[in-house]
């Protein structure tokens, strides 16, 4: 029997804020994370993502606002239902892997006799079974990170909070972690993870919130966020890239913006532009196409337009906190 209610959100933030002196790291913020969601907290470095997570976990105290976990005010009982992988990796380097994981599990109320089979299962899954009796300092940084992830999940939490979880992992281990997140979601767990790498959110999440300079600029199911964005896009693949061909596309009357990816072009249309007319005009110019498809905006496009280049650079003194 858990403390969760079927009708309550996994996490609800009501007007929480946090300042460090004159720096407003998080302005009054409202968020609702449904149970069972894979929820991406997106934003550039220094946006306030980590500060928000630390307030959820009671590492920091909000200046204002209320936080509800599974429908109830923050409490140790609620926090024990959360697994947390911090952005700052931290392990006891001289401890052995199995001993460290048993210690982490015990901190969350899991007895050693119960944690042993869980530890063995996760070490096998993460291809670390042969390092169970190695000291952490003998492991690579990537393997240390995998150990820390195992430590965050041994108590089988209902909610997982992962702060930049893919940082430091090679592509193979990034794929393994994505598979695990997908399995956890299928099992009904709520996954909240922060990232500034939009591709990860696009692949994994069903809900997102985009934060810039401590304020929420978009929030909701990904499909709804894309619909609300409003603009229509066309994906074009040229038979062969040439500067002249790209220039022709840019000059067409219905085109607002073009982003290049080799022979692939992402074209944002002006209000009222007709994609069929655009295709007709493009063919008439003699530009040879391999693909022309009306598409929805990518999260990356929405992120760039909502956040803006101005927020991509945040002063170093702010980054130290947020």
Q: How would you name each of these model-derived features?
A:
Residues 18, 257-260, 294:
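Hydrophobic/anchoring residues in structured secondary elements
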Residues 72, 216, 239-241, 272-273, ...:
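Short, surface-exposed acidic/glycine-rich loop or hinge patches that mediate macromolecular interfaces
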Residues 2-5, 270-322:
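C-terminal coupling/interaction segments
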Residues 8-13, 18-213, 217-218:
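ABC transporter nucleotide-binding domains
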Residues 73, 111, 129, 255-256, ...:
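Short coil/loop linkers at secondary-structure junctions
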Residues 70, 100, 109, 227-230, ...:
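A generic structural signal for secondary-structure junctions
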Residues 178-270:
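ABC transporter nucleotide-binding domain
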């Amino acid at each position: 029997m858990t403390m969760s209610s079927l009708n309550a959100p996994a996490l609800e933030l009501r007007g929480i804020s946090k300042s460090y002196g004159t720096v407003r790291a998080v302005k009054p913020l409202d968020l609702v994370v449904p149970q069972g969601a894979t929820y991406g907290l997106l934003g550039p470095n220094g946006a306030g993502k980590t500060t928000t997570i630390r307030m959820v976990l009671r590492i920091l105290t909000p200046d204002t606002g209320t936080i509800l976990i599974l429908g109830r005010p923050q409490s140790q009982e609620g926090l024990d239902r959360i697994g947390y992988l911090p952005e700052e990796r931290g392990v006891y380097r001289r401890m052995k892997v199995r001993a460290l994981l048993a210690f982490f599990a015990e901190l969350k109320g899991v007895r050693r006799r119960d944690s042993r089979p869980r530890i063995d299962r996760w070490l096998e899954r993460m291809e670390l079974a042969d390092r169970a009796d190695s000291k952490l300092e003998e492991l690579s940084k990537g393997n240390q990170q995998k150990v820390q992830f195992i430590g965050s999940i041994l108590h089988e939490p209902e909610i997982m909070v992962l702060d930049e979880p893919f940082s430091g992992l090679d592509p193979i281990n990034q794929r393994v972690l994505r598979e695990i997140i997908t399995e956890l979601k299928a099992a009904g767990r709520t996954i909240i993870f922060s990232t500034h790498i939009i591709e990860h959110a696009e692949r994994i999440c069903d809900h997102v919130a985009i934060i810039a300079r401590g304020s929420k600029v978009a929030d909701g199911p990904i499909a709804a966020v894309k619909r609300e964005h409003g603009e229509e896009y066309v994906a074009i693949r040229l038979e062969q890239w040439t500067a002249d061909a790209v220039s022709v596309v840019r000059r067409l009357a219905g085109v607002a913006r073009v982003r290049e990816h080799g022979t692939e072009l992402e074209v944002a249309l002006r209000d009222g532009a007709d994609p069929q007319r655009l295709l007709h005009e493009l063919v008439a110019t003699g530009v040879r196409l391999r693909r022309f498809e009306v598409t929805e905006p990518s999260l990356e496009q929405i992120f760039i337009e909502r956040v803006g280049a101005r927020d991509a650079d945040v002063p170093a003194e702010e980054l130290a906190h947020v």
